[in-house]
Amino acid sequence: MGLEEQGRAREDTPLLGKGRPLSSKFKTFANVFIAIVGAGVLGLPYAFKRTGWLMGLLTLFSVAALINHCMMLLVHIRRKLGVSNIGSFGDLGFAACGNLGRFVVDILIILSQAGFCVGYLIFIGNTLANLSKPTKSTTLMSLRHLMGVSPKSLYIWGCFPFQLGLNSIKTLTHLAPLSIFADVVDLGAMAVVIVEDIKITVVQRPQVVAFGGMSVFFYGMGVAVYAFEGVGMVLPLESETKDKDKFGKVLALSMLFIAVMYGSFGVLGYMAFGDDTMDIITANLGAGVVSSLVQLGLCINLFFTFPLMMNPVFEIVERRFWSGMYCVWLRWLLVLAVTLVALLVPNFADFLSLVGSSVCCALGFVLPSLFHLMVFKDEMEWKQRALDVGILLLGVILGVSGTWSSLTEIFQE
């Protein structure tokens, strides 16, 4: 196997690359954190505003428990099959139900990864447009009136040529360390927002609600599922763990820690701003220097995370349509498609809910429970069978209802 082939990414390739030594418990914990925590957390306060803080918390912790359970289902399936070359979700789909299984997983991974990148562009466009609101006539305003486009669209199109260049890189080894930067900036932004939330809450106590009603339940589920999406990384992470018998415990503790962090962030953000909570919480921080630096930092980290998240899409599309060979024009077409979708979607949090309700529900709930049913069908007790069927049906119901709810919200904008 040549060096170039070894450097090619697959849908199971961790963003930080695969290290030679196996991972300790702490490193596994950190890898789970990096694989899951992303920009979705910034939409949680707005989701709590829609669902109510108590319903939001219940939804968040329920989704965390379900995602953790379904991740472990994938691990149990691989151990049961005992096939050494099952390294990714797609490989497991093929082992469980042949080419159809791999095809379905591939399609959903393409949609989910591309959906994340659409969300990144929406965030960048909306944030930069918010930061650069002119107080008088400027070149930006002149361009807007001349071209008939919004500032958000101008910023997204401004990213486009640079993304073409970044996504033309065959191997992302040199960009991979930026995923560490992305998580550091995310944590920094969360810390700044939490501090500001506490300071604002002490001064003013806006009215908040505990339950927003069942009409927004599926909306909240979609945002929560998006925020915890990372099921495709569980197999490579488990493969790299030194003490595999303790992997389930480490994963559960990681998910609990992330859920507590997410819940605190969402509740404090909503408690601070109440009905004025915006779809991207950093926009509530005002126009100060610290706020601007945090928002610019988030834009930069998402800008460089974009090609990392698109890499699994390129791998799948090139494997299926270009014999696995590098194809720059195919990559450019995919980047163009993602850009065009980002231009059409107005609201960051609404889009999180759409992707979470549709694609992430299928990847996180439906497929793991379905594959588990198929592989363990001859030795399952009725309780386990009922649990798998229940999760499968829940995933389908949440997917259909949440997708409809999110599309309704988007088209009402």
From Swiss-Prot:
Keywords: Amino-acid transport, Membrane, Transmembrane, Transmembrane helix, Transport, Vacuole. GO terms for cellular component: vacuolar membrane. Residues 49-54, 125-145, 196-207, 271-288, 353-355, 412-413 are vacuolar. Ubiquitous. It is found in: Vacuole membrane. The keyword Membrane applies. The lineage of its organism: Eukaryota, Viridiplantae, Streptophyta, Embryophyta, Tracheophyta. It is a multi-pass membrane protein. It comes from Arabidopsis thaliana (Mouse-ear cress). InterPro entries: AA_transpt_TM. GO terms for molecular function: neutral L-amino acid transmembrane transporter activity. This is Amino acid transporter AVT3B. The chain crosses the membrane at residues 28-48, 55-75, 104-124, 146-166, 175-195, 208-228, 250-270, 289-309, 332-352, 356-376, 391-411. Residues 1-27, 76-103, 167-174, 229-249, 310-331, 377-390 are cytoplasmic. One of its GO terms (biological process) is neutral amino acid transport. Translocates preferentially neutral amino acids from the vacuole to the cytoplasm. Belongs to the amino acid/polyamine transporter 2 family. Amino acid/auxin permease (AAAP) (TC 2.A.18.8) subfamily.
